[in-house]
Amino acid sequence: AASDVYKRQDYIVQVDDETKRQQSFDCEYDPSLTGETTIPVKALDPAPLNAKKVIARRAALLLLNMSNEAVINLGIGIPELVSSVANEEGIGDSLTMTVEAGAIGGVPLGGVRFGASVNAEAYMDQATQFDFYDGGGLDLTCLGLAECDKDGNINVSKFGTRIAGCGGFVNITQNTKNVVFCGTFTTGKLREEIKDGELHITQEGKVKKFVPEVGHITFSGNYARKHKQHVLYITERAVFEMKEDGVHLTEIAPGVDLQKDVLDQMGFKPIIDDVKLMPAFLF
């Protein structure tokens, strides 16, 4: 009977097989993920230098201008690397990094450990974490970039007939003052080379991310403009900023050809005023 559902109980089951009781996909138990112990954050391995790390480095530059009381959210994918870069540069513990699973403070991890944080100061249940996000508690968020159009809209939820869903994307972006979307400029067998402080495209991606109109609006550019949010779109070869009159191209990577590598790979023409080079030290 339906009423029997409410009579069910939870159980604690002892499991001797270590492979079936792992704390995360790649380890049995790490006490630094529970607050039982802390570890020197310098012991964490830095991410290898590639296009994704360049994007994370550019996003991490924004953290330098934030107060020590700033609260940051990091999404899955390339945004995961922002905490790694911040930690590598020695600024990770000066800000409060959070992830939607409930970790507050510490160094959020990526890959198969996404959702956990080393040396977290606190853990909340996910619903409470989202109450905090919904209430405007975040100063900045870094999230993924799958599709972007001329109005600054972002799609991460629907691609053709495939519905990925928005997850917490909408909650996180609606009331956050500074929103940063991070992703490679194109995708699908994209190959790039980083050498001598420059970026070179050796094989262009088959799929364009900057399109005339996104297939689904997960983030509304018009809503962001109405509510005076500061929005950046950071890729490995170009940086864009949303302004009142549309999406502006503000930076390109050294070594990149503006026409061939940027404008020709876009489904719309951004507003171009004063384009600067991305800092060479990012590469």
Model-derived segments and spans:
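Conserved phosphate- and dinucleotide-binding cores of soluble alpha/beta proteins
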Residues: 1-40, 111-283
